[in-house]
Structure formats: C-alpha cells, structure tokens
C-alpha cells in the first residue's frame, strides 16, 4: 500500500465519525449539506481570536495568531495562554527601484479594542507600522497568511507548519515551527527586500530568591556551514531544572545579518535603536559575539535575510524555530506519590538541544514537507463538505498542543482539556477519551500505548479499572470508583486497536485484563487485599449482578454523576463491549467465553428494548433507593409511570419494582 493510499484509508476512517451530520432530522437541503465549498478565510476583526498551534506530538507548541503575530510560546511543558512573548516578531523592509523604502512588522495592524491594564504593552511595539489587512486560512497542519498593504510593493504570503505525518509519530514529534515567507515582486522594476526575525530570549530560571526571572541569558550565533542562526540558553540554574533547555531560530539562506543582542539601554531604547537601524536601509549592524545578560534582564537577537527580486520573481525565505526543554514535572496531581515527580519528554531521547533539532529538521526538510503535504492534499482535495474537513482537521490540531505528552518510555498521555496555564482533569480519563478518534486512526501506535496503560497497569485482577492515570506510573493508583462508560468503552477501543493493527499477539497480551474488566460488570469487586480495600468502599454492588446484559447498579459516568437503573447511555457501551469481546475471545482461542458473552449480549439487547423503548425513543429507568424522598418537582404523575418501574417508597423489593407513587423520570433520547 502506497503512502497516499494509507493516508486515504486513515482519512476515510477519521471522517467516518462525522457521518452523523447527514442523519437525523433534515435541517438543511441536500445540496447545501453536500456542497464542497472552499475553506473558510478570516480577515478583519475575525482575526482577533485565531490561535493556530504549531508544534510536535507531545512537544508543546507556539501559536500563530490570525494577524500573523506569534501569540504564545507554549514550549515549557505547560499552557501559556494570553501571554504574548515580548519583542518577538517578523519584519520586512522593501525598496522598489527609484522609490522610497518601506519597513513594517509582518503582521496586520492591531485590532480594537486596545485593551490592557496599562494599554498595549510596549514590548509588543504597538506604535510600529504594520500591514493594513491580513487573510488567514487554516488548513491544518498548514496555516496560510496573506498580508496586504498598498505601501508595500511586493506580495507577501506565509506558510507555517510542523511536520504532521500519519503513522509516523517520530517524524510528527519534532519540537519546531517552520515559517516559509513567500515574497513576490509584482512590479516592473527590481526590488530590494529584507526579512528579519527578532526574539527575546524567553528562558526564565530560578534566581537566588527562588523566583523565576531573567539572568545570565545567552544568545550565541552559530554558522556550522549548513545552517546559520541563534541558539538561546541560560547559564543560570541546574541541568535537571525544569527551565533547563534551549531554543534556536535559523535559516538556510546565505546572505544574512545577525545581532546576538540588541542595544542594551533603558526605557524603550533597544527597540528604538533596532527599528531605526533596520528601517533605514534594510540592514542591521552585525553583533555576533556572545555575552550573558545581566541579572533580571534578557536580550533580543535578530537574524536578517537580505535579497533582490527581479520583476515577476518570487522567493521563499525559510525560518525555523526549534526548542528543547526535556524536563517535566507532575504539577497537576495532589497525590503525594506523584506530586512534583520529574520525568523527561520523549523527544529528549532523539535530540540533545535545540540546534540539534534544527539540524535534523533541515536535513530532512524535503521528505518531512512532502509527506505532510500529501496528507494535507488528500484531506483538503477530497469531496467532503468544507465544514466536515474544517471540523476534522481543526480537531486534529489538539494533538500538537500541551493537551498531550509523550514520556521518555514512549507512553502517551493526555488531559481532558487545558486551562490558560495548566492541564485540566488528568490523565487519560477513560470516558472522555472515549470520544476521541483521531489518534487511533492517524497515530495508532500511540493509541495502543494508552490501552496498554489502561489494562496492563490500571486494571486489577478483579477487573476494577481506575479511569485516571497517575504518572509516573508506580505501585499506586487513583482511588476513585470505577467508571461504567469509560471501562466498557475501553474494551471497545481494544477491539478497535486490534482491528486497525491486525496484531492478535498484542490482543493476547491484553486479553486477560480485558476479560476481567468485562466480567467485573457482574462479579464486582470481590475479595481484595487490605491495601485495595478502598475498592469495596467505592463500589458496593456490581453493575449487572444477575448477568442479564442490563446494567442497573450504581454507574459512575462521564457526566460526573451516578446512574441508578437501566439506561442506554452506559447500556449501549456495555452491549458493545460484550459484542466486541465475543469476537476477541474467539480470536485468542477462548471459545467458551465467546459463547458466554454472546448469550449475555443477545439477552441484554432484548431486555433494553423491552424495558426502555417506548415506541418513540429510549427512556431511562431510575431506581430510587428505599426510603429516599424524591423532591416534588421531580415526581411524575402516577399515570406517567406506566412505562416506568422504580424502587420507591411504596414499591416492593426486587431489582425492578412495580410502579411507584414517587417515581423519578429521566428521558434520554438517542
């Protein structure tokens, strides 16, 4: 199977999850639904909230704003929303033959309202000229920006990306952002052009007062005969410190100017001196020596590429921003076993520093670019409606953010979501990650690593599966009740991973724990060691104690509540797990179990229809504990209880009592 064929296969699999758009009640006409259309383009005030993540799998990212600005540096192993990096920008100088030169920051002009506690920060250079308008188009993994301004005599476009190559997490896990500036001379005369990238060394380390601050930051100019650019580090702090690491920004162009540090002055002098120098003739004074910054200060460095364009000529100027911050810390858990524990990023096994990353990226740039482009073209040149392509591609971008991480043992982990400065709801939450499909189809080896963690570490012999993972892994677990939808969904996901890979040996390795997790539904906790007695406290009774294929016990679920009684939310996942296990048991030679699961599945399928289908939709039957007084506003009229059997104050005992006078109704439509 060719690379293109593989991408088409995975594309179809991923897009299959979007088929729901075409089902149900018809809200749009068919011609509108099936209209391919073009990818959305954003301009004007719509650019304000665009944040396009660029980074590798589990490496962190930078975000490119809709105006062309670098919005955030999220490269230090946690989110960093809303913190625009100081003095970090691209700029252009152009001189058309016989005319006055023009210099601008390569961004659209700022968008009102100009809100900040003391106005727009000076380190974002709000007073420096920018382009009149921008058009941003997101075709993940590529972000495309077009800048327009009548004062600028060249056409300016940006293509920004990070390698995104399905089936290759190694090539898709590079801590880098690539900026290809495409400059075209549409005039009839020659033009001179300079493109510069400036960046403040952003590394903050612990000072003598144990506060994160600048100090002893070092910017080094390196020309290794292959690439030229700046490597940024700090000489303050220990090698194993969380802040320890480096950045680099480089180019393959030969004609460059460089400054390892801007003028060291007070107030606004550094930016003022730089802009006067740059805007004068498109060149800057070369400063290539290295000198540590003072305590409490850091330095801005610049790499400038200068060139000429004949009429009609176009040139691509590449810049590569790379980073290397290998040390992570568990800041998100309160459990003493893991709180503050340190571990390393997977990319630290492949690279030694940010310059090493840049060298690898550029040596392999053609292959990495073309393979990324193939995936992009298969997706965006397909006949799926544009809104489906937009939804699927934009969601895939989550894999290139701090939502996920890859530990140095190769295992993959993910939060439920992100706040502005931290991960939210750790880690590998089984019911939330039930919704996720992209990883399994595009990077299946990483998805399989998550199943291995779920079953080989987080599932006990009795089948009790904890639904959050504590990392680093160890002889400790998150001591909460098991999650019915997450546990059953996880079994279905093992089935999915087995089907996608065809690796029955992998399935055999997981099968004992998969079987235990399924049968936990009717066996429950059982006898456990003293150190696991908390399991009995978390779940008193099994989900399906009479083994009839219907869950009616306490079912913790993704709504962070408990269901009591039969329902098709957890019930459908239970049936799916049974059906999947019928086939998996057969594949591993466990035919007796295969037959047993099939009997339970068929019984449960009939029972759910019999109990919950009212002729129009499925309802939920809520088993109310004996003696519990149901609030008046939740009581139904007695005549509404005809399809409902609840354990209420006046109902007899048994699993499903007779209709109650105090009967709680909850309708769930599918």
Question: What residue spans do the PLM features occupy?
Answer:
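Inter-helical turn/loop segments and adjacent helix faces that build the functional surface
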Residues: 184-185, 190, 497-508, 580-598
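Substrate-binding groove/exosite segments of carbohydrate-active enzymes
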Residues: 40-85, 282-300, 306, 313, ...
């Amino acid at each position: 199977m060719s690379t293109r064929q593989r991408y088409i296969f995975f594309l179809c699999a991923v897009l299959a999850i979007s088929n729901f758009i075409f089902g149900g009640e018809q809200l749009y006409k068919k011609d509108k639904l099936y209209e391919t259309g073009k990818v959305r383009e954003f301009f004007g005030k719509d650019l304000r909230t665009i944040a396009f993540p660029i980074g590798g799998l589990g490496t962190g990212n930078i975000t490119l704003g809709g105006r062309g600005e670098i919005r955030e540096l999220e490269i230090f192993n946690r989110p960093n929303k809303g913190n625009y990096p100081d003095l970090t920008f691209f700029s252009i100088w152009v001189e058309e033959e016989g005319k006055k030169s023009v210099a601008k920051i390569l961004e659209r002009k700022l968008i009102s309202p100009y809100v900040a506690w003391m106005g727009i920060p000076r380190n974002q250079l709000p007073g420096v000229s920018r382009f009149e308008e921008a058009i941003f188009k997101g075709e993940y993994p590529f972000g495309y920006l077009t800048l327009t301004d009548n004062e600028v005599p060249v056409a300016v476009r940006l293509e920004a990306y990070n390698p995104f190559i399905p089936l290759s997490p190694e090539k898709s896990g590079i801590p880098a952002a690539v900026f290809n500036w495409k400059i075209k001379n549409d005039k009839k005369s020659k033009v001179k052009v300079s493109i510069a990238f400036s960046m403040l060394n952003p590394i903050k380390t612990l000072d003598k007062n144990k506060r994160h601050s600048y100090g002893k930051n070092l910017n080094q100019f390196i020309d290794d005969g292959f690439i030229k650019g700046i490597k940024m580090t700090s000489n303050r702090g220990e090698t194993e410190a969380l802040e320890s690491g480096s950045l680099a920004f480089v180019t393959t162009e030969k004609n460059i100017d460089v400054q390892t540090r801007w003028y060291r002055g007070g107030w606004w002098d550094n930016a003022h001196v730089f802009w006067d120098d740059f805007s004068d003739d498109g060149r800057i004074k070369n400063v290539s020596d290295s000198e540590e910054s003072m305590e409490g200060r850091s330095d801005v460095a610049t790499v400038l590429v200068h060139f000429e364009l004949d009429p009609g000529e176009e040139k691509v100027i590449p810049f590569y921003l790379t980073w290397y911050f290998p040390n992570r810390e568990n800041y998100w858990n309160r459990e003493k076993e893991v709180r503050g524990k340190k571990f390393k990023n997977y990319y630290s096994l492949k690279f030694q520093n940010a310059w090493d990353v840049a060298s690898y990226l550029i040596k392999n740039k053609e292959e990495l670019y073309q393979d990324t482009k193939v995936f992009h073209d298969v997706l965006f040149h397909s006949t799926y409606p544009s809104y489906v392509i937009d939804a699927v591609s934009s969601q895939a971008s989550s894999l290139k953010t701090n939502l996920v991480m890859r530990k140095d043992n190769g295992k993959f982990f993910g939060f439920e979501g992100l706040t502005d400065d931290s991960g939210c709801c750790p880690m590998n939450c089984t019911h939330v990650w039930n919704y996720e499909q992209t990883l399994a189809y595009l990077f299946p080896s990483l998805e399989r690593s998550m199943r291995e963690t779920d079953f080989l570490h987080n599932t006990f012999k009795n089948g009790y599966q904890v639904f959050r993972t504590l990392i680093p892994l160890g002889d400790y677990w998150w001591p909460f009740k098991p999650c019915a939808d997450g546990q059953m969904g996880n079994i279905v996901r093992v089935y999915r991973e087995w089907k996608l890979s065809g690796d029955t040996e992998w399935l055999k390795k997981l099968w004992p724990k998969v079987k235990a997790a399924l049968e936990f539904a009717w066996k429950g906790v059982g006898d456990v060691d003293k150190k696991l007695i908390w399991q009995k406290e978390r779940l008193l009774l099994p989900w399906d104690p009479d083994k009839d294929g219907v869950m009616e016990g306490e079912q913790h679920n993704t709504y962070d509540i408990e269901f009591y009684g039969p329902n098709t939310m957890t019930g459908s996942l239970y049936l799916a797990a049974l059906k999947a296990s019928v086939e998996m048991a057969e594949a591993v030679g466990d035919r007796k179990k295969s037959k047993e699961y099939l009997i339970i599945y068929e019984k449960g399928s009939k029972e759910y229809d019999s109990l919950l289908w009212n002729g129009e939709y499925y309802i939920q039957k809520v088993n109310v504990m004996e003696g519990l007084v149901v609030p008046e506003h939740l009581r139904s009229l007695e005549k509404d209880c005809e399809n409902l059997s609840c354990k209420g104050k006046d109902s007899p005992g048994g699993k499903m009592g007779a209709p109650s006078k105090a009967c709680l109704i909850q309708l769930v439509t599918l």
